[in-house]
Amino acid sequence: MITSLLAGMTILVIGDSHLATPGYLITTLHDELQKKGAVVYSYGACGMAAADWVKPTKMKSPPPCGTATRLNNSPIDVNPGPNTGTVPYGELVQRHTPNLVVFVMGDTMAAYKEPTLPRAWAWQQVTSLTKAVRVNPVKCAWVGPAWGTDGGMFAKNNKRVAEISELLSETVAPCTYINSLNLIKKSEIRAFDGQHYDAAGYKKWGQVISKALDSPEVAGKAKQR
């Protein structure tokens, strides 16, 4: 018998490259939410920042990493690009009428290759999307980035991860912030390229996100709407 607070809910998950490849969160998080009795619609797009989900935005990252969609029990539909892009948040809400929207975004706005975090730009990205949330009000949660490995092709570094996580925690309202850094230890997740994780890492991350969503603060409030 399913006793989860998420049971019977419709959940829309929107994210960056962590949701754009089979085996990543579009597999693990999606599966975990379904196990709890939710109907789940997941959308991922490589290299897209938050504001890119406010209006249709063409793919920025070169193939083979493009977009991916998973509509509840349907198989994952991967489009490697370049002729693909985002579906706006407002359109997705109208299409799926979710009880809860989950954003998984942070790495694309951390600008790891830049000498400093572009705080004003990142703030603008986030608030552009949260403004759209207020126009199409649905209870939402925002999942911040998890620890990575310093270096690699994306130049991810954990000092910057902590910086962008702090900025997100102060900026994502009305969404509830889920701080991945507090949910999973560095030793529990391994990034093979500095930013993206092996199968065990995505499984662990999907589990802790699902557990955080299955709480009175998130799922409970979503059901009250």
Tell where the protein language model's regions lie, with residue ranges.
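Hydrophobic alpha-helical targeting segments used for export or membrane insertion
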Residues: 1-10
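Conserved SGNH/GDSL esterase-like catalytic core that processes O-acyl groups on lipids
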Residues: 11-14, 18-116
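Sec-exported extracytoplasmic/periplasmic mature domains
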Residues: 19, 23, 30-38, 94, ...
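Extracytoplasmic/secreted cell-surface and envelope-processing proteins
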Residues: 21-24, 51, 110-115, 119, ...
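Extracytoplasmic/secreted envelope proteins and their assembly/folding machinery
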Residues: 26, 30, 86, 90, ...
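Active-site segments of SGNH/GDSL-like serine hydrolases
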Residues: 102-112, 129-162
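Catalytic His-Asp segment of secreted/periplasmic serine-dependent ester chemistry enzymes
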Residues: 146-225
